[in-house]
Amino acid sequence: MVDNTSIATKSALQAAFSSASSLPLLVSSPGAHGQSGGGGGMKLEAVMENLQRQQAARLALEEKLRQAEKEKDIRSMVESQIQQQALAFRHYQAAVRGAFAAGVPNSSSGHPLERRAESDIDDEDDEDDDPELDRGMDDEERDMDEDDSMNEGGGDEDLEGPLAHYPPRHAVYPGAGQSPKSTPIHLSRVQPPYPAPRQAESPSALAPQAQSQHHEWTYEEQFKQLYELDDDEKRKEFLDDLFSFMQKRGTPVNRIPIMAKQVLDLYTLYKLVTEKGGLVEVINKKIWREITKGLNLPTSITSAAFTLRTQYMKYLYPYECEKRGLSSPGELQAAIDSNRREGRRQSYGSTLFNYSPVGTPTLLASPKLQMPHISMPTPNGGHMTQTPGIKKEDSMLSSCLTNRVGIPMSLAGHHSAAQAAAAAAVQAAALEQLREKLESGEPPEKKVMLMAEEQQRIMQHALQQNLFAMATQLPMNIKLNNRDDRQETALNLSTNGISSINMSIEINGVVYTGVLFARKPAIGFMPSSQRVHHQHSSQGKSNSPGLSSHIQPSSSASSSASSHGPATSP
């Protein structure tokens, strides 16, 4: 066809040139033969019309030639691409068959691999929309996959599920990603959330692999199990809505939580919690055990409440706030903080005022309020001073609180340890209460006054309780009273930090009387010199050892008594 058109074009061009060359002859002929001017004009017009027709025919032929050449180039390009696609597809099929025959290692099961290999062809339209997946493929391979997807047909139906908008997960299968000619073939494709089951080529060969790796669920299998846990019609609707909401929120669900070796039923968890009034109500009422039973989880799971609360906050609580509005994030944080403080108060209350004859060598302290250690006098007159360490948000409170209250007694070693443990427990509880009061936002001046009063009251109460506890455990006769004619000054507490306590203790017939004066804390938390007034009266000769007590809170005093007369505490 091309040859015929070229020959016709050449003949037309020759005819046009010959007619053009004969034009001067025709023009000059009228003068030579003596014809009239009118006849010469008509011939000239006829020649011009003939030339115009020939030129139009020549242009039309040239246009046809150009179109024919374009069609020929396109046809040859398409034929070459089809041949390349067919060759690459044969290599691809050979690689897949070789992978199945050899048994692909590191794959969860045979069925997901086959589904991925088939969906690599069916879902190529989605792959063209993703620039990251196209990065490793050239134009010819993309054309090949597009052509194959047209031949297969119906490939997009698998992606019409509720989770088609989620980003794909890339899985690499070693040994199945290269053809026999080392042509890179990409097998990492996203599988639909719950695709229709397909029959494997050799189920008997793939069954052992599926059984050996039964517990290693893939991302798609987890979603499929979540949708197929029961036949509730609202389950699919809820899960579709939940995943769409999380995707729009910018926090897509990329994995399903596993609890007790099974997929956590998000639908049932949400339904149980919202029926109880929402997450905040469940936390405040502490009914996580009912939620655990409703989910058919074993009750022996450790920290099940914490795990369920964490997973609910991550996957379901934003959806609850959006759809139901049962609580706000501020209320949730307040409920969590309240639950945490309650747990600490219970642990403190269990050890408060408990006396143990053995005691513990270490002293308890508040976990969140760490204050400096005090200097303790030793029997040989030396001092053991520990480096102060303060860790508190409010710096002005550092000079008003202490970390430990030591009451070393010369009766026995375990007596002093028990006294110290009980006093430390008392102070830990007091410091926890003070911390909660301080967090309520009171002025700094009022905080200091409240702490001074609280410390003085706690220390006197701790002394009395500890001595009574020893009296119940040991065969001693102890009397504790306030001997002072002025009853109003027996316990003098004031808000300016100045106070005094008159104490009288009788142990095994020996009476120890003293006045505890308040003093202001030193700058470096070192004990300052203080005089202590005391009286000593004995009924008969007694060689019982003296009782020396050293109490050093922030607004308390130090006192020591012995059988030799007045003494000054270091």
Curated annotation (Swiss-Prot):
Residues 519-531 are annotated as: Important for cytoplasmic localization. One of its GO terms (molecular function) is DNA binding. The keyword Nucleus applies. Residues 232-324 form the ARID domain. The modification Phosphoserine is found at residues 179, 356, 542, 569. Residues 102-215, 528-570 are annotated as: Disordered. It is found in: Nucleus; Cytoplasm. Residues 120-160 have a biased composition (Acidic residues). Residues 429-523 form the REKLES domain. One of its GO terms (biological process) is regulation of transcription by RNA polymerase II. Keywords: Cytoplasm, DNA-binding, Nucleus, Phosphoprotein, Transcription, Transcription regulation. GO terms for cellular component: cytoplasm; nucleus. InterPro entries: ARI3A/B/C, ARID_dom, ARID_dom_sf, REKLES_domain. Homodimer. PANTHER family: AT-RICH INTERACTIVE DOMAIN-CONTAINING PROTEIN 3C (PTHR15348:SF2), AT-RICH INTERACTIVE DOMAIN-CONTAINING PROTEIN ARID DOMAIN- CONTAINING PROTEIN DEAD RINGER PROTEIN B-CELL REGULATOR OF IGH TRANSCRIPTION BRIGHT (PTHR15348). Transcription factor. This is AT-rich interactive domain-containing protein 3A. It comes from Danio rerio (Zebrafish).
